[in-house]
Amino acid sequence: MREFLEKCKEEYTLKIPQLLKEVRLKTHYTKWSKTVLPAYQLEPFDTELLGYKLGRFLKNEPQINKHVKHYFFDSEDKIVGRLEYDFYNNYEKEWVVTRFLYIYIQDGIFELKLSSSHITEEPTKINRITYVRLFNDKVIESYNLHNDNRFSKLVYKYSDNKIVSIERDLWIPNLLKSIYEIEYPDENTYIIWEIDNDSRVKIYPKEDS
């Protein structure tokens, strides 16, 4: 799978201008958020595995500031792009942003995190490529390849249409394995535990959250 992502990264890098144009053409409506963490995640529980809550969409367009994020959706309510405002360059008098592109193929979705650039410029590189494999519209596996050669694989297991465990293999470059269990006390609440040998460590929600 690493080789597959490397090949896709090379191919999509050459198509960045075309892919950015397709986002503009496909966009049917947009949403906003202004939290440090995004309000959308392709990989299930990606934010929560870090111990944090997922951001929330706003009802109205906010004033542009650091951490503001703009999401682009097509006519089928699929996300096709995301733009994050990183910081304002006082010398150039314009914002530096990071763009994300979403590409849909049969039984899978790609997320491309592009290199940061001024908002009036087009990025030229892909800093991270993520691929999620779908089965019956559910994410069953995800793969990440970073510019620093970090590579990860996550496997999601379901029960009653809910994710109940996640197994992660991370190469940095040595292999690190992690196992997480997810409990659902009720329909609106979930708890994530990291399994460490015979013990369980609660990682979400944090006790002070």
Where do the PLM segments sit?
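Buried hydrophobic residues that stabilize the cores of well-folded domains
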Residues: M1-S209
